[in-house]
C-alpha cells in the first residue's frame, strides 16, 4: 500500500488521505493478540467498560485505495502485525 501510494504521488500533487485497511473490522483484543504472536511476548492489557464517547465500531473503507492506487490488502491482522513488528525492529536496530 505504501509503495503504491508513493507511485501515485509521482504523478499527482496535493494532499489526500487513503485508508490502507482490509475493510474488515478488527477488535483491539485481536490487535493485542496479533502483536503478542508476532513478538512472542505478552502485551499487558485490561478489559474495562466502554467510556462515554468511545466509538463502538470503526474500520477503514479501502475503496479509495483500490480505485486510485490499484491496491488491495492481501493479508489479515496477524500477518500485518508480524510485518509491523519486523519493520519496527529493523528501524530500531538501524538507529541504535
Feature map (PLM): residue ranges:
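C-terminal substrate-binding subdomain of Rossmann-fold SDR/epimerase-dehydratase oxidoreductases
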Residues: 1-96
